[in-house]
Amino acid sequence: MKFIIKLFPEITIKSQSVRLRFIKILTGNIRNVLKHYDETLAVVRHWDNIEVRAKDENQRLAIRDALTRIPGIHHILEVEDVPFTDMHDIFEKALVQYRDQLEGKTFCVRVKRRGKHDFSSIDVERYVGGGLNQHIESARVKLTNPDVTVHLEVEDDRLLLIKGRYEGIGGFPIGTQEDVLSLISGGFDSGVSSYMLMRRGCRVHYCFFNLGGAAHEIGVRQVAHYLWNRFGSSHRVRFVAINFEPVVGEILEKIDDGQMGVILKRMMVRAASKVAERYGVQALVTGEALGQVSSQTLTNLRLIDNVSDTLILRPLISYDKEHIINLARQIGTEDFARTMPEYCGVISKSPTVKAVKSKIEAEEEKFDFSILDKVVEEANNVDIREIAQQTEQEVVEVETVNGFGPNDVILDIRSIDEQEDKPLKVEGIDVVSLPFYKLSTKFGDLDQSKTWLLWCERGVMSRLQALYLREQGFNNVKVYRP
């Protein structure tokens, strides 16, 4: 099988040296992602495209799907590469490839040509289009908005029969820009802002301020791992978790109610800046949008920025909530965000929307900054690839089984889309579907006399959710790994 990778247009207008660097990085990223599917595949770069050739036909769909999620790719063409002799040979090969697709449909033919030939692209379009129209009685030519567009590419003595075109996510290849540290809470905003910086070519590390215990951190780990695995797995990144409960406690005890929100955000920026400096990261990323909450007015944002020299990027600053939620839905983080607890908004009953710098600084004089230094020093830094392994170590009390007993039921916790695409059927045992994001509210409604074997494709989510359910007092859960 063969795929032709077309570059994001902004890459093609770069200078020759920059364009070549971007293409080299994108080629390396593609190799890093696809080697998990087929170690024998070949990735070959050209000036205006990248070729991916693989032998394992069983991995075709997985490879195609992975390519559509790698930043820097505009679209992917799945092609059949065959030799040809003349225009009639091109027509005959196109007829075999497209006959079934064109039955009862309107169509047109579009050709791209490179090399020296005694015909033009338009000549091929007319010849092939006329031939298809004659040999497929139920099809008819329609040059504007046809049901099917027959795409052909001619290069020297090779014909590329395009079997399908699939849109990529665009943007710049990860690694072409410098690293950033995303302040991730697991909600709609931080997930989308992290994705936007990945799409713009940054390697995104994650910094999480834990205000809600182990269950909250587990949820945010899921979001960070999902974003990395789906869009950024070509690079290693860090997940840094900071226990911020002592800081919140100090704020609640000593800070005036109206100033709490701004001061909490200032403490987060201070802490994140220290983490960024430690790892040589150039900028912080937040999901703040102008006017969305009290701490996100221009006055308050300026005061928050003042505590650090580190650049703070806010890709969502002009977005409304509906737009952000739509983006979260597109990238697959909506379901995570809907069930994620939000702690930042509850610590102040009457927050100020226009904080005064002198008042903020006066309130901060009451704060014991050694607490902030201590929580940063004790921050837990994990390679995001080790989240699954670390979870397995944490869930020592959750049994992993590869078989089942008479009282067991398999609980498929994949998302609804994954379940519909690839239903789980296991002979000799009932399988119940309950997406992971509904476990916190719906697991208690299940028959608690049964033992529930949590299952997902890779086992990461099932381990994380097993830990969460154990913490909630459910002891009738195991992890199923056949």
From Swiss-Prot:
It is an enzyme of class 2 (transferase). NCBIfam families: ThiI_C_thiazole, tRNA uracil 4-sulfurtransferase ThiI. Residues 404-482 form the Rhodanese domain. The gene is thiI. GO terms for molecular function: ATP binding; CCA tRNA nucleotidyltransferase activity; tRNA binding; tRNA-uracil-4 sulfurtransferase activity. It comes from the Bacteria. Catalyzes the ATP-dependent transfer of a sulfur to tRNA to produce 4-thiouridine in position 8 of tRNAs, which functions as a near-UV photosensor. Also catalyzes the transfer of sulfur to the sulfur carrier protein ThiS, forming ThiS-thiocarboxylate. This is a step in the synthesis of thiazole, in the thiamine biosynthesis pathway. The sulfur is donated as persulfide by IscS. This is tRNA sulfurtransferase. It comes from Escherichia coli O127:H6 (strain E2348/69 / EPEC). The keyword Transferase applies. Pfam families: ThiI, ThiI_fer, THUMP. GO terms for cellular component: cytosol. Disulfide bonds join 344-456. ATP binds at residues 183-184, 265, 287, 296. InterPro entries: Rhodanese-like_dom, Rhodanese-like_dom_sf, Rossmann-like_a/b/a_fold, ThiI_AANH, ThiI_fer, ThiI_N, THII_Thiazole_biosynth_dom, THUMP_dom. Belongs to the ThiI family. The keyword Disulfide bond applies.
